[in-house]
Amino acid sequence: MARKKQSGGRKVEGWKAKNWYKVHAPEFLGKQFIGEIISSNPENVPGRVLTVSLGELIQDYSKQNVRASFKIMNVAGDAAYTQFNGHEMTKEFVRAMVKKRASRVDSTITVTPLGSTRELQVTITAFTINHARLSQVQELRAKMVKVVEDSAKEADFESFVSAMLKGELSKKMFAECKPIFPVRRIEIIKSESVSSAADRAAALIR
């Protein structure tokens, strides 16, 4: 019994030695409070990733099936500030979008938003109403990719991510693709911040 009490005491002391840090979303999302993490050393906080419901973050119920992740970049006092790290629609939601006698058109590309040193790998998916022929699938894919690449050339990183998360890019792709073939929905189902070519080259030199 004495050993158990001592063990419990050490655990309490260990928890007391740790601090809670309030994690905030990036500035383009209003620096909203998105959660808390605990650490005994503030130097160990940067680099950690927090994943939250996008629907709750931007107050849009239609985005409840989307999870967004944010990477902590720096700490000031008990506040931890993040940058966008990526997002993903739940696999269950994506599967539910696939209907019989219809086509699913996917494309994964990497874009570098205007003036940014950060790259984003995005997966675009179109769900058609009817089965599409190969030529129609290819045309849909090319149009989706063009819309996203053109948008990245015209918007900085924060503006591009905001348009992606809020569905503005999806609406633009839908409008452009609808004349090609009847589509039911087009979404960027996943994105991930990846190292730029310059960063990869610098890492090799080091």
UniProtKB/Swiss-Prot annotation:
Record protein name field: Small ribosomal subunit protein eS1
UniProt KW Ribonucleoprotein keyword: yes
Keywords: Ribonucleoprotein, Ribosomal protein
Entry's Gene Ontology cellular component terms: ribonucleoprotein complex; ribosome
Molecular function GO terms recorded: structural constituent of ribosome
Species for this entry: Methanocorpusculum labreanum (strain ATCC 43576 / DSM 4855 / Z)
HAMAP family: Ribosomal_eS1
Entry keyword Lyase: no
Family in the record: Belongs to the eukaryotic ribosomal protein eS1 family.
Gene designation per UniProt: rps3ae
Biological processes, Gene Ontology terms: translation
Pfam entry (one): Ribosomal_S3Ae
